[in-house]
Amino acid sequence: MPSGIMLKQREIVLIPIPFTDLTSQKRRPAVVISSDNYNETHEDIVVVALTSNAEPRDFTITLTSDDLEQGVLKVTSMIRTDKSYTLNKSIIIKVFGRVKTHILLKIKEFLLKIIEQHNTVN
């Protein structure tokens, strides 16, 4: 991504994701969840994955173009709040949309549920 472009919370970005065997990579969309202040003061951003596989599963949020403040989705997609990544801003390929505030609130709710799940302690 060209330097000098400021990434904002709620933006939808395109990022390269490597295959698990690291032989290749594929471009995938993601939603920026780190705060604007964090994004301004750090080289990294925090994102959650976005997929066009519209099969509902735990910790997913359905996303349509109606849920966007900016941009358009070609197909109904799912936000995978269980797939979060910290990435260097330099690998961002492009910004192509921004989700509405209510979607960020849903993302936060799901992240809190993931963090607060009861686990067995050994």
Language model: regions and residue ranges:
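Helix-hairpin-helix/helix-loop-helix acidic hairpins
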Residues: M1-P2
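C-terminal terminal-subdomain/extension
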Residues: I5, E69-N122
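Short, charged beta-turn/beta-strand-edge "cap" motif at the junction between a beta-strand
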Residues: P18-L22
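Compact nucleic-acid interaction/catalytic patches
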Residues: T23-K26, V32-D67
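A structural motif
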Residues: A30-V31, V47, T81, I107
